[in-house]
Amino acid sequence: MGQKIHPVGFRLGITKDHKSCWYADPKRYPELLQEDHKIRQYIEKTLNNAGISDIRIERKAEQIELGIHTARPGVVVGRGGSGIEQLREGLQKLLGSARQIRVNVIEVPNADADAALMAEYIGQQLERRVSFRRVVRQALQRAERAEVKGIKIQVSGRLNGAEIARTEWVREGRVPLHTLRADIDYAYRTALTTYGILGIKVWIFKGEVIPGQEAAIVAPPSQPRRKSRRQQFDDRSQDG
């Protein structure tokens, strides 16, 4: 079950929180859900070069409060706050209302320990036609420097322009998908290449969260019982 279900949805209410927090009349739920989807799409399209990791939405009466988690807060804020103002005006025009929109920009402290930013980095490199094995190896090195407890990367599609699509994955450290208290960050991105679309999935294990404690507890290192998947991956990568 832990291998199939979405890692974030599986842990909602345990170690993960909902990305949209609001209450509304049942008749307005479809309308507000569509608004949330439009807001996220607009922000991701407008700030596609700002390293957006997460977008949180809260509604209070007629006020919408947005929390934008980004690796480059300066790009979002702009000179003198002009970027925030343009974003707010664009959202008001998109929603077609004069509701008050408040934008909070939160900096991601460690971009290499964030699954969304890691998947975005891999996608950008693949779109530049860099060998996927080299990209995955670089991503693993960046994750190791960020001192995460485990990372798993999966790339699917016509890798390196191969005729037959396939799936390759590599894991370093522990990624316990069945453990509900495990703080696992997950992201899915696509890369548009000349050969077609590549799917990228990233799981990052940051430690275990005990109820009543906010910080993740470092998991004890496990003894490897067999040849690691990364070694197998590197052995096959000698030819390409």
UniProtKB/Swiss-Prot annotation:
It comes from the Bacteria. Residues 219-240 are annotated as: Disordered. SUPFAM superfamilies: Prokaryotic type KH domain (KH-domain type II), Ribosomal protein S3 C-terminal domain. One of its GO terms (cellular component) is cytosolic small ribosomal subunit. GO terms for molecular function: mRNA binding; rRNA binding; structural constituent of ribosome. Keywords: Ribonucleoprotein, Ribosomal protein, RNA-binding, rRNA-binding. Gene3D superfamilies: 3.30.300.20, Ribosomal protein S3, C-terminal domain (3.30.1140.32). Residues 39-109 form the KH type-2 domain. InterPro entries: KH_dom (IPR004087), KH_dom-like_a/b (IPR015946), KH_dom_type_2 (IPR004044), KH_sf_prok-type (IPR009019), Ribosomal_S3_C_sf (IPR036419), Ribosomal_uS3_bac-typ (IPR005704), Ribosomal_uS3_C (IPR001351), Ribosomal_uS3_CS (IPR018280). GO terms for biological process: translation. Residues 231-240 have a biased composition (Basic and acidic residues). NCBIfam families: rpsC_bact. Belongs to the universal ribosomal protein uS3 family. Binds the lower part of the 30S subunit head. Binds mRNA in the 70S ribosome, positioning it for translation. Part of the 30S ribosomal subunit. Forms a tight complex with proteins S10 and S14. This is Small ribosomal subunit protein uS3. It comes from Synechocystis sp. (strain ATCC 27184 / PCC 6803 / Kazusa).
